[in-house]
Amino acid sequence: MTAIVEPTWEERRTPEAAHEDDARSQYRKDYSRIIHSAALRRLQTKTQVLGLGDSDFYRTRLTHSLEVAQIGVGILLEIQRRFAGSNIEKYLPDERLLEAICLSHDYGHPPFGHGGERALNFAMREYGGFEGNAQTFRILSKLEKYSQNSGLNPTRRTLLGVLKYPTTYSNSMTNDFRRGTDIDKYPDAELKPPKCIYDCDLDVLDWVLKIFCSEDVTEFKKLDYKCKPLHKSLDCSLMETADDIAYTVHDLEDCIKLKLINREMWDAYIKSADYSEATRLEIEKWNQRIFSKEGNLVKQGISNMVYFFIHSVIQYEHEELSHPILKYGFKLGEEAARLRSAIQKIITNEVIKTHRVRVLESKGQRMIFSIFGELVRDPESFLPRETLDKYNKATGNLRMRVICDYVSGMTDEYATKTYQRFFTPKFGSVFDV
């Protein structure tokens, strides 16, 4: 009689032979695979805020991911200090596990940011859609080169950590795209994908959640009235909080450096009277530094902001869930969250929604949709050999998924060149790759 093997956190979907002379933990192995992955390298040419420029100062998705990992560990260390000896402490991730989760959280970010995401979601509307976080989950578990069919073949807990939305596209999709096949007829809000994983990756989700009791799995997958998942794991909450801190503070730094945001704009949005005395003093400290002409003072101000947000993290509980890794989570405290939202509103209104950035995003959206259309029209002629082999082996909707995987993996620069080779007269040669 075969013994039943209980699932574990360090288990991988495809079993691997152990090396006796390998001193690394399973999570260190995950971290190593992510560090050396092509998906991580591609993030170096995907900009964090579209259109900020080509200077080596401005952040890319790669530098952002590195900063998320560092902030994530900072939050973890603060929590370990604060909860030393408590029941929660033994369920906290180790540093390498959290770094692995944070480093890979943007794997699925498509070319041209949200414009690219909207274009691919519309192009895939009849074939399972597209969503950046769903693509991250797919890259880690199926696409990235390491194993035959399991991507990087990461541990169960690493996959759970990047799983922001534990529901499928078909369960959460609310838009039926009744306006027809012309993408230009749809406002951006109608092109946005639901927060999900793909239906074709449900097998991985089921495997990840196999470690929990059926009651927890049912509750964990529940959606709110907007069809958005209600829950995420402890590790994912740490990653998401670090991500929120990183992109808010560091996008602000880039925008100040570019002179897109000035002190007058800041004062118009950040009303210190709206906050407690301790937070008002903190804001005043930032005011004296982040707009200084001295680079060292600016950097100190940005560091002060990160420190403030890290030390504002609080613990929460979902009483409906029983397993501690689903039950417990961490987020910014109410006042810190309100302040972060105010800072993000400056960036959104004064930079991201400006004509300059919106034109670039719209252009990127059109380019990605056009590239996808050409590849679908004649995959035999236009897909690279390796991708074409996958396409020919796939059936049904999965053929379109192969094309979507290929386009979403392009960098901004490669997508631009691909578009030009298709549509710009006299551009390109047989030597282009």
Curated annotation (Swiss-Prot):
Keyword terms of this UniProt record: Hydrolase
Domain of life according to the entry: Bacteria
Annotated HD domain residues: 61-248
UniProt GO BP: dGTP catabolic process
Record-level Gene Ontology MF annotations: dGTPase activity
Endpoints of the signal sequence: none
Similarity comment: Belongs to the dGTPase family. Type 2 subfamily.
The name this protein goes by in its record: Deoxyguanosinetriphosphate triphosphohydrolase-like protein 2
